Amino acid sequence: WQKLDAAVPALAAAPFRLTPENFLGRHSFPLGFDRDTQRLYFASNADRDTYGIYCLNLQTGLRTDLAIEHRKLDLADPGDALRTEQLVYDRVGKKVVGVRMNAPAWPTTAWFDPELNAVQQSLERGAQKSVVQILEWDAKRENFLVHLAGEYDPGAFMIFRRTAAKLQERARCAPELTPEVLNRSLPFSFDASAGRRLSGVVTYPRSPRIVPPPVLVYFHDGPWGRDVPGFNR
């Protein structure tokens, strides 16, 4: 066994060891290993106000060049330590190729692989205001299993044929939830009087019993969580 704090003295200001004193302060936490177990992906708020995502070479004890950061948003939740759903593995290449994250506008995937990043950007351009998740692909990276969901659409699983640049729907999610029964949800944001940018999602009732309908404000769990656009059943 190897203590991470001893292996990475450079992160002494934001240690991996969790204490009541640093839980809401500066600390680091692991997300998961690469397939060779020599690289550890982790999140840290060392020398910054938000959690970024990084990679540690366990053989050298040094960080790699990987750094995914956002000045205003936490890209990982300390409560999700070692939940590997955030890491995307390539079963063919047997390595981590991306990280799922809640981007400023829409949830997306930060790909380390340029080829997969190009596919992601192509799909997002063709499906604006949608959450696009590439789930699987074949060895030649010709056929991709993709999940697309909209602002108030539970979405569908699709096959993307890369050469033909075509999406083929294969299965709907919650097909009983048709547009006729769904309430419309849209993201919003505004500058508060203190100058801080606030954002959220507003749901408009389809058939309100009171006009205008009352407003119910629901705050997300904190302190790191935040509401993001996309379907919420």
Could you tell me what each predicted segment is?
Residues 1-199, 203-212, 223-233:
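Peripheral, non-catalytic segments that deliver or gate enzyme domains
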